[in-house]
């Protein structure tokens, strides 16, 4: 038995060295826009615990802004509340399936969770409420109040409201410690307020009473119920009336806002702010007509409602509660000034403090969206204030207020959690030596630059780069140092591809003050290091020219319309332009110059476009061409050519082959020296249709290859009994797609290869030596209208695969000569590289020992019905995980062997991969010293032997 155990331990294990990880890659954790936040201090640890709109729960180190821990909740789950008692963290979240109650340790470990089902027959469910009560956690939701055991999460008791329909809203714990009672407030369908008094020990009903007499339209109040810190009042809004219940009485007082605030407009859209203050409420009134927005503080301590203060303009309020029970209210005016109001335990409020400056820039981040206050005691006994700010661009930053201007502790660009569209890469500037403009350059002049370059290369090859040292801001010889351009929302980001460092971020402000944030639709590279950012701002279409190296705005233009599609044009002189289509199918040029119009007119018969309409009631794929406009006020217009109707009850997905990707060879050389001509059609669009997994209709997956110029369906495959999710990857002449097969309860991958029906006996040697074809030359372009274009030879093969795939892409290299690999982003958050040889449609059905010599020379792999497990050495992300992966992009470097891989989801990940090893570059651990020493030794030995030979011949001649 011991021998068997010993032999089992001798099985080979795949691994990598620790110094190999994070050497050529980086991982950026994102959280999303902050929705809730609280602060926690324990010993020397200072944390900000936040919940985001992206269903993420995380703790940030207040010193650096780094993520201490993070929990990614399921998609579609909305966190509605965060609470802590100093020892544990309580989170409440809602989904269509119910409300989740979770208890976490302050280090991010989930202690227990529970699911509360929705009320039967309820059309709309309001957010739950919870509090810590003795040895348990009490939660009110729907028509019930449930208590959970603090230690294990078991249900201790549950109280259900009887009678008419009710929605429980708030919980209060009133009374002394030994005689505490639980009061649960809800709204009945008749519009009355239900107050149920329960025992926190067993949930027994003490009293229950319906208060007030209001219309049934108040059954679901638009305003949340707000409880004052002293728990003396419960308030909510009904229309323009403020309803206030005095705890301990049966009275509901009504105050009309028009009478209380006659000078303000927009009272019908006013909202109570969720601030817990002693004897005070905060009311946010939006701008209306000429009346500006205002925030009103209402005092409710004297039995009535009195306006304590009216704050005009853009004001953000935040509150904090000290351990001694003192409340602090912070007021942020315009994002640049901070004033503080302190409350005594008896509820007495002080005046606003002297203004302190905040270094907030609205030009870089937009308006403030939310603020959270963290007050702390300074060494001199005074109070200091930190502010956690969430802005319009989703950025999260910690600021320290001070009279001398304050400072920004850190900034997290959380807009990177919602990156949209494709990525754009722009090389960094090269290091150059300014030469004398007069006279030809000389070697003596270039020698210092050459020596500096050699010294820099030597230091990069031998030195170990410090982790806190920024990556160089200049290009390298391998093309791995570039600017990675991403866009999300109204912001464009420039990241360093070597380190993930944020080089710059450009916020696009709305044209109209107070308008919704614009949306960056596309980023298109121009000539040089300039890029166009196409932005949709309400009914305006804006085109921004940005410097990709620093994010500076070079120029901006605007036009009317809603963007539908944009295409890049390249003129004969090397300049670039844009063709823009709006929702009315109108065509515009940028820049609209005579040279641009003349260039488009000269190639008018070669412009073809396709548009995929997914959001319409009847989805369709339509093809268009460009023609001269009949309207004298326009130059060009779209002409419909073909249309393909699509079903409306399926999930649509599509992908194409990048127009700039290189194809190394137009043929595939077989083992018998014959060739198969690749069907290289850059007009192909891979269109996938898949029924949802929970659909009651007949399940199927259908994949079509459509020529977007002629509208011909070149290939179509239908898989019955299969369903979504469907993921596609299209390369030069092959397609790979991944889907779920419900009949066999497994994931499957299908590979399809297309070859032209060509019988010419081309010489393989001449085809390979001739190099890659220039497909931008019209002589080498694909003719979509030829008879052979619609009749390729198709070979397909399907394999079983052991995991779900969220996205995939094929590697791209500088010349397209390197064997391809498929990059898979698994649903578990890993990036996996898979050789295309494993997905070859011509894998022979023989044992490896019986393969012919020709099959071995061709590099074929014996057939197997499954692709097997994932080799750990093929996992590019190694110890990292990409939360919710959505896209995979690849890009070439100047090295033919190497391709850049970018994984995008909630997180960002970038690495380099070499499918055929780095055959054109020395390894990083190459012994450069030994090489230089060997060359120097051989040089000295050669000179010495030459001298010795001449000396010997001279001595021999004298004899």
Where are these regions (language model features)?
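WD40 beta-propeller blade core
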Residues: 58, 102, 146, 194-196, ...
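C-terminal scaffolding/assembly regions of large eukaryotic complex subunits
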Residues: 19-40, 45, 62, 399, ...
């Amino acid at each position: 038995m011991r021998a068997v155990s010993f032999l089992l331990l001798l099985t080979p294990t795949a691994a990598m060295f620790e110094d190999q990880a994070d050497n050529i890659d980086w991982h950026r954790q994102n959280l999303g826009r902050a929705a809730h936040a609280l602060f926690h201090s324990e010993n020397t640890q200072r944390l900000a615990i936040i919940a985001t709109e992206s269903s993420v729960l995380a703790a940030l180190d207040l010193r650096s802004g780094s993520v201490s821990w993070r929990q990614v909740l399921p998609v579609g789950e909305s966190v509605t509340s965060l609470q802590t008692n100093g020892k544990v963290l309580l989170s409440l979240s809602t989904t269509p399936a119910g409300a989740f109650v979770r208890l976490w340790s302050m280090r991010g470990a989930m202690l227990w969770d529970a699911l509360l089902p929705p009320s039967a027959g309820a059309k709309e469910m309001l957010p739950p409420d919870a509090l810590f009560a003795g040895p348990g956690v009490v939660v009110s939701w729907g028509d019930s109040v449930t208590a959970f055991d603090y230690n294990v999460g078991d249900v201790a008791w549950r109280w259900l409201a009887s009678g008419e329909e009710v929605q429980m809203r708030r919980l209060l714990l009133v009374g002394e410690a030994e005689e505490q009672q639980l009061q649960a407030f809800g709204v009945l369908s008749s519009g009355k307020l239900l107050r149920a008094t329960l025992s926190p020990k067993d949930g027994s009903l003490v009293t229950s009473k319906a208060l007030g007499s209001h219309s049934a339209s108040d059954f679901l109040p638009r305003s949340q119920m707000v409880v004052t810190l002293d728990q003396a009042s419960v308030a909510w809004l009904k229309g323009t009336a403020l309803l206030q219940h005095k705890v301990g009485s049966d009275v509901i007082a009504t105050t009309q806002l028009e009478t209380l605030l006659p000078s303000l407009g927009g009272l019908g859209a006013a909202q109570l702010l969720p601030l817990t203050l002693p004897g005070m409420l905060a009311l946010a009134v939006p701008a209306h007509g000429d009346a500006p927005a205002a925030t009103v503080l209402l005092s409710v301590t004297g039995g009535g409602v009195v306006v304590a203060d009216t704050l005009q303009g853009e004001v953000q309020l935040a509150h904090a509660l000290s351990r001694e029970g003192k409340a602090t209210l912070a007021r942020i005016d315009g994002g640049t000034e901070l004033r503080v109001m302190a409350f005594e335990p008896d509820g007495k409020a002080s005046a606003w403090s002297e203004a302190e400056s905040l270094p907030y820039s609205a030009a870089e981040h937009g308006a403030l969206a939310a603020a959270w206050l963290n007050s702390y005691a300074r060494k001199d006994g005074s109070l200091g204030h930190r502010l956690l700010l969430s802005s319009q661009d989703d950025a999260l930053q910690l600021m320290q207020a001070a009279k001398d201007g304050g400072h920004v502790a850190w900034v997290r660009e959380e807009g990177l959690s919602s990156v949209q569209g494709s990525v754009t890469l722009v090389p960094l500037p090269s290091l150059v030596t300014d030469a004398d403009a007069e006279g030809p350059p000389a070697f003596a002049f270039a020698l210092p630059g050459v020596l500096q370059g050699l010294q820099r290369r030597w230091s990069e090859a031998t030195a170990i780069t410090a982790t806190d040292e920024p990556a160089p801001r200049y290009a390298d010889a391998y093309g791995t140092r570039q600017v990675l351009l991403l866009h999300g929302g109204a912001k464009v980001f420039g990241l360093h591809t070597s380190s993930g460092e944020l080089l710059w971020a450009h916020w696009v402000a709305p044209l109209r003050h107070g308008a919704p944030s614009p949306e960056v639709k596309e980023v298109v590279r121009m000539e040089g290091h300039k890029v166009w950012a196409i932005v949709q701002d309400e009914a305006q279409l804006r085109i921004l020219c940005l410097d990709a190296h620093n994010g500076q705005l070079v120029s901006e233009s605007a036009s009317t319309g809603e963007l539908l599609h944009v295409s890049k044009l390249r003129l004969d002189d090397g300049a670039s332009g844009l063709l823009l289509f709006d929702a009315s199918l109108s065509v515009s040029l940028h820049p609209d110059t005579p040279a641009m119009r003349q260039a488009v007119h000269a190639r008018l018969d070669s412009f073809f476009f396709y548009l995929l309409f997914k959001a319409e009631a009847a989805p369709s794929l339509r093809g268009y061409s460009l023609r001269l406009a009949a309207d004298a006020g326009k130059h060009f217009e779209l002409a419909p050519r073909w249309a393909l109707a699509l079903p409306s009850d399926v999930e649509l997905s599509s992908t194409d082959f990048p127009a700039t990707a290189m194809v190394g060879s137009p043929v595939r050389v077989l083992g018998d020296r014959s060739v198969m001509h690749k069907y290289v059609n850059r007009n192909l669009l891979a269109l996938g249709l898949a029924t949802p997994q929970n659909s009651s209709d007949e399940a199927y997956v259908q994949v079509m290859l459509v020529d977007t110029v002629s509208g011909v369906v070149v290939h179509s495959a239908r898989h019955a009994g299969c369903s979504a999710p469907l993921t596609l990857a299209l390369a030069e002449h092959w397609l790979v797609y991944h889907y779920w097969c419900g009949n066999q309860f497994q994931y499957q991958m299908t590979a399809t290869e297309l070859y032209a029906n060509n019988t010419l006996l081309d010489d393989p040697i001449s085809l390979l030596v001739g190099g890659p074809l220039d497909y931008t030359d019209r002589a080498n372009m694909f003719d979509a209208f030829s008879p052979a274009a619609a009749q390729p030879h198709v070979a397909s093969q399907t394999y079983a695969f052991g995991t779900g795939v969220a996205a995939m892409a094929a590697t791209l290299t500088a010349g397209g000569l390197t064997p391809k690999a498929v990059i898979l982003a698994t649903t578990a958050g890993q990036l996996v590289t898979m050789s295309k040889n494993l997905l070859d449609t011509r894998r022979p059905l023989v044992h490896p020992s019986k393969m012919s010599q020709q099959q071995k020379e061709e590099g074929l792999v014996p057939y197997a019905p499954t692709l097997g497990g994932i080799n750990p050495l093929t996992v590019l992300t190694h110890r990292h995980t990409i939360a919710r992966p959505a896209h995979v992009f690849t890009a070439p470097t100047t090295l033919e062997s190497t391709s850049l891989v970018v994984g995008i989801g909630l997180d960002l990940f970038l690495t380099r991969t070499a499918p055929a090893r780095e055959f054109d570059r020395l390894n990083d651990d190459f012994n450069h010293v030994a090489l230089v020493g060997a060359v120097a030794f051989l040089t000295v030995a050669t000179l010495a032997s030459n001298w010795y030979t001449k000396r010997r011949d001279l001595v021999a001649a004298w004899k």
